[in-house]
Regions:
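Transmembrane alpha-helical segments in multi-pass inner-membrane proteins
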Residues: 18, 68-73, 200-207, 214-305
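Membrane-interfacial amphipathic/re-entrant helices at transmembrane-helix boundaries
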Residues: 1-21, 49, 60-69, 97-101, ...
Length: 328
């Protein structure tokens, strides 16, 4: 039971980050039906910028919280600029092109941003500054740290803030109108180009914060970190229903839980070595290591992509998505 509760805590923490990143995918897709595969690299840039700023400010004597906040405050505008430039220079000229063209462009932008980051920060795995001391609390047999609590709280606040923006503001109304029908929205006075640009900028800002949270939680940053993180967040968006904001939130949390529970419970087959033909079949592995691991924490990515495959096969519209026909 304690293990189950611990994996729930770990899954909620990781899933909260996935949910925030997934919002960037689902917002863009909801507006222009584009899967922005470069969004993971925006998250990576946010983590890298924060890494640089936090490293520079850590020896100055500022409080750890202030240092992290300044690092995040520096990462957000940089990522917003990257997101705006991406939309303005790479995607807007292709808005009327066949859907495959912007998709290929998104992959190209992703590779470009990766290599630019490699030139700036090197190809090495960077140790993200751990300047906030971890304090553990016991919750029903599970251990949860102050960092995990902060990550979950920040992600919940971001998701709540985005929901208010989308459903309670004039910009949100314009975004929903553009998602429904850009042509009609334009006829009604909505500046469609500005709304689309704002969507990219908001998604990039969320990605910047997610990058800082991810680096703080896992303690590492690298120029390739956006690839797997981005694909996991995309899986979360598909799981919840791509283009559906509540679906992205739900999908992110569920994906984090599936990963954590899968890594925690599936994989240690050591007990099977004691039984009959299984012992004979795996005797070499058991004799060499004393146990046989099929999955586990080293293979937790498998569970994320298995979820993606299963959803695409059995429910392509996602948990909260609606099946709609192609636009005329």
């Amino acid at each position: 039971m304690d293990t189950f509760l611990q994996q729930l805590v770990n899954g909620l923490t990781a899933g909260s980050v996935y949910a925030v990143v997934a919002l960037g995918y689902t917002m863009v897709y909801g507006i222009i039906q584009l899967i922005n595969f470069a969004h993971g690299e925006v998250v990576m840039i946010g983590a890298m910028v924060a890494f640089t700023v936090i490293n520079a400010l850590a020896p100055t004597g500022l409080s750890p919280l202030a240092v992290v906040l300044v690092g995040t405050a520096c990462a957000i505008p940089v990522c917003m600029l990257v997101g705006y430039s991406m939309e303005r220079l790479a995607y807007r000229p292709l808005r009327g092109a066949p859907r495959l063209a912007p998709l290929i462009t998104a992959i190209g932008v992703s590779i470009l941003l990766q290599h630019l980051a490699m030139l700036v920060w090197s190809r090495n795995v960077l140790a993200f500054p751990q300047i906030i001391n971890n304090t553990s609390y016991t919750l029903g047999g599970a251990s949860i740290t102050n960092v995990q609590i902060a990550i979950i709280a920040v992600c919940v606040a971001l998701m709540g803030g985005l929901a208010l923006l989308v459903y309670r503001t004039q910009l949100g109304t314009a975004m929903r109108a553009t998602a429904q029908d850009p042509h009609v929205a334009g006829l009604m006075g909505v500046d469609v180009n500005r709304v689309i640009a704002a969507t990219f900028v908001i998604g990039a800002a969320l990605g910047a914060v997610a990058g800082v949270l991810y680096g703080t939680y896992y303690g590492v940053a690298q120029y390739t970190m956006g690839s797997i993180l981005g694909l996991k967040a995309f899986s979360a968006a598909v799981l919840g229903g791509i283009g559906n904001i509540p679906g992205a939130m739900l999908g992110g949390v569920l994906l984090g839980l599936v990963e954590a529970l899968g890594a925690g419970y599936i994989g240690d087959l050591s007990d099977l070595c004691a039984y009959g033909w299984i012992a004979d079949f795996m005797s070499e592995q058991c004799a060499a290591a004393g146990h046989f691991i099929l999955f586990g924490s080293n293979y937790q990515d498998v569970f994320a992509f298995l979820v993606l495959i299963l959803v695409l096969v059995f429910r392509p519209s996602g948990l909260l998505g609606e099946r709609v026909g192609d636009r005329a």
